[in-house]
């Protein structure tokens, strides 16, 4: 399954989760898109609930199904911690996500574009792979030639707060993942146990 590239507002309403990070799409219409959206509240089966939760998490990070599933498989190999949380930590350590968490982009989709276009450095070296796994302490910065890109500057200015597990220097346009996040610091709206149940049946 390819990565979803359609309208984020419609997808947000379908999932009941803001993919833009603003919440505006749900504040305006908090029901699924379509002619019967306001009345489409049928009860989901156990499988339907698991699938819906998996889709919410996958779309929030903007990944294709194959890439998302492969990351879950990697999480199963961890020797410590719970599977669901380990999976979410791997998602958080993606370079595009860290760029987003630092406030260098307004959405994860935009962060992925910045990485793909070579605007981002890791420890002073250009990395254009969005899935690159960031290690706590590595310095994430903007390439010198990209420091005046309007979209990056606008994102930094628009960011009101950052998670406690990252640090950021707005003047230098650089920051780092200072530590791995705690469970209550990421995606409180997600029930990762349902995602684990879904893949345990599929794998």
Curated annotation (Swiss-Prot):
A GO biological process held by the record: translation
DNA repair among keywords: no
Gene Ontology CC terms: small ribosomal subunit
S4 RNA-binding domain sequence ranges: 93-156
GO molecular function annotation: rRNA binding; structural constituent of ribosome
Name recorded for this polypeptide: Small ribosomal subunit protein uS4
Keywords assigned: Ribonucleoprotein, Ribosomal protein, RNA-binding, rRNA-binding
Family: Belongs to the universal ribosomal protein uS4 family.
Pfam families linked: Ribosomal_S4, S4
Subunit structure and binding partners: Part of the 30S ribosomal subunit. Contacts protein S5. The interaction surface between S4 and S5 is involved in control of translational fidelity.
CDD domains reported in the protein's UniProt record: S4
Organism (species): Streptococcus agalactiae serotype V (strain ATCC BAA-611 / 2603 V/R)
UniProt function note: One of the primary rRNA binding proteins, it binds directly to 16S rRNA where it nucleates assembly of the body of the 30S subunit.
Gene: rpsD
